[in-house]
Amino acid sequence: MARLEPEPPAASSMESESEEPEHPLDGLLSKHDELVRKEPQIAANIGEQLKHMDLESLPLTVRRRIRDVAARHKPANVVEVGAGIGHLSAWLFDLWQDEEFRPDRYAMVEAGGKFGIILTRLMRRYEASKWADVVVAEWLDVVANVNAWNAAFATTPDIAALEAPPIPHPIDLCIVDVGWKRQVECVMAAIPLLSNNGLLLTNEPDVPTGDLASLEGDEASSEEAKVAAFNEWITLVKMLNDTHNVGFVPMFGGTLVGIQRKG
């Protein structure tokens, strides 16, 4: 009988070196196999509304994966920045009909007053008024108010306690969907408000593909702005890598990015 020779050590070490180590966020950002994949009917209806209003939303794959991550992470305090008319919110409300996954507090932050009215109707439709809120304000203004509240609480806690902060914090899950123009500043403002195990989710901005040399006028200016914004995004990711785990999940239509403090 022929004897099987052991693999040469050099070959086996080469194989182990070629295998990519698992990223710390791989499990948290992965698909949730126990949840249905079909879009909830209310979310689908909102998607049709968006088409009629000529507005965009996160890709279906990204919305569904955010729902999956929310179910796995089970956050107590959730803040959605740039909630729009509730396309993603409807996915989350649908998940949180099951009290096993429901957070203690959920704040939908939206700058548009008319959108805020639509979000309030959505919240009431899911009978979520006891644990959900609609905050109509610019995100940077909300953050400034939270920081002011924290400063007041540190010096005069009895007085500060009489007025609740505008959003629940520290934030266990923060979802940022504000478009490429303001994405970097809004993500940077949200990071310090995360809890120790807090997770920030956002859709990676599209890589600019236009040929600046062939563009003129407004088209050239718009493409230059996109390039500058994407470069700012790359700089932010590099900076965060020193203190945070930054995970990327490429999917059809977009790439979900997860950011969580190391350790």
Briefly describe each language-model feature range:
Residues 70-74, 166-170, 240:
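Flexible, charged surface loops at secondary-structure boundaries
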Residues 167, 180-263:
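C-terminal substrate-binding/active-site "lid" region of AdoMet-derived donor-dependent transferases
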Residues 2-11, 131-213:
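Active-site segment flanking the S-adenosylmethionine/decSAM binding pocket
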Residues 55-145:
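SAM cofactor-binding core of SAM-dependent methyltransferases
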